[in-house]
């Protein structure tokens, strides 16, 4: 049987879940890299100061600070799959909140949306990092994690091109 970083010795393949989880690494790299682009747009469109626009990063990373432990507890109780689902739901809600925010033109509303996105990203990272390590043989877990993390970097590169 052909060796693979996502196949067990018994022949079970985890290729599909690995691809799905690895795409999440790209997603959160993209989300982080687009923050600076959003920041500049908020300064111009909403006419806010550079100091006030620093709240963009503060609320996203505040979501990490406040959600990290609850996300870990959630994962311990319900598992990685439900952690990924919770993260995607929160991320999606935060992103969808940008639509009414575009009508309200309220910086505070956008900040709340970004906070929800940050909470979702926290759940995704808390679940995806350990989950990708169990999708195959244990001795290949570092290789799987490194490969997945490389897509995070790709998201960081692509984000400003899409948002700019």
Where are these regions (language model features)?
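Membrane-interface helix termini in secondary transporters
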Residues: 41, 72-73, 77
């Amino acid at each position: 049987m052909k060796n693979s970083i996502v196949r067990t010795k018994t022949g079970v393949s985890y290729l599909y879940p690995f691809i799905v989880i690895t795409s999440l690494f790209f997603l959160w790299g993209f989300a982080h890299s687009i923050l600076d682009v959003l920041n500049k747009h908020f300064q111009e469109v909403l006419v806010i100061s550079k100091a006030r626009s620093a709240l963009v990063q503060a609320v996203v990373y505040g979501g990490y600070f406040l959600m990290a432990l609850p996300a870990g507890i959630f994962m311990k109780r319900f598992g990685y799959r439900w952690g990924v689902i919770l993260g995607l739901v929160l991320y999606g809600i935060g992103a969808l909140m940008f639509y009414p925010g575009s009508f309200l033109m309220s910086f505070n509303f956008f900040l709340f949306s970004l906070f929800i996105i940050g909470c979702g990203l926290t759940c995704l990272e808390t679940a995806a990092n350990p989950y990708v390590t169990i999708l195959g043989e244990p001795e290949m877990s570092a290789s799987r994690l490194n490969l997945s993390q490389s897509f995070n970097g790709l998201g960081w590169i692509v984000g400003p091109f899409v948002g700019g």
